[in-house]
A protein has these predicted regions:
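Eukaryotic intrinsically disordered, low-complexity regulatory tails and linkers enriched
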Residues: 140-144
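An alpha-helical repeat/solenoid feature that recognizes helix-turn-helix modules
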Residues: 1-31, 35-138
Length: 144
């Protein structure tokens, strides 16, 4: 089975990995997704579009869900892409590909017309980075 986009892989993996079935197919899907990582270390949703934080974050989450270690070179390249494309305000800019279907209003999230997809892209990027963060055990404020 060949799955062309990170979006399709993640949708497929959500059910299949958690079911514990089809391990060979999961490995094949992982390899297919890894093969679509670009020279800039990111992923794109559609082959002809630029890499984005949205697609890269989603691809990394899919790969980690499928069993790729966050220490793997592929994952770390994706992390570097995300860190290199993060905006000064902490968000990631993702250009919308959709037609305008509702009146524009400013939510307060940066990037104007592209704020909604950028908010989702920022969420995926943040999730992917959090998976790669070192484990941290919180301590009580009083030190106990």
């Amino acid at each position: 089975m060949h799955i062309e986009t990170a979006a399709n892989v993640l949708r497929w993996l959500r059910g299949v990995v958690w079911s514990g079935k089809y391990k060979d197919a999961v490995q094949k899907a992982m390899q297919d997704l890894i093969a679509t990582q670009r020279g800039d270390r990111g992923w794109a949703d559609i082959g002809t579009t630029p890499s984005t934080a949205f697609a890269t974050g989603r691809a990394l989450v899919a790969l980690q869900t499928a069993g790729l270690l966050v220490s793997d070179e592929v994952y770390q390249k994706g992390v570097k892409y995300l860190l290199s494309t993060q905006q000064e305000d902490g968000s990631w800019f993702v250009r919308s590909r959709s037609m305008t279907f509702q009146p524009y209003f400013d939510s307060g999230f940066p990037h104007g017309f592209d704020q909604w997809i950028s908010a989702v892209g920022t969420s995926w990027a943040t999730l992917a980075l959090s998976l790669a963060a070192p484990a941290h055990t919180p301590t009580a404020a009083n030190g106990q």
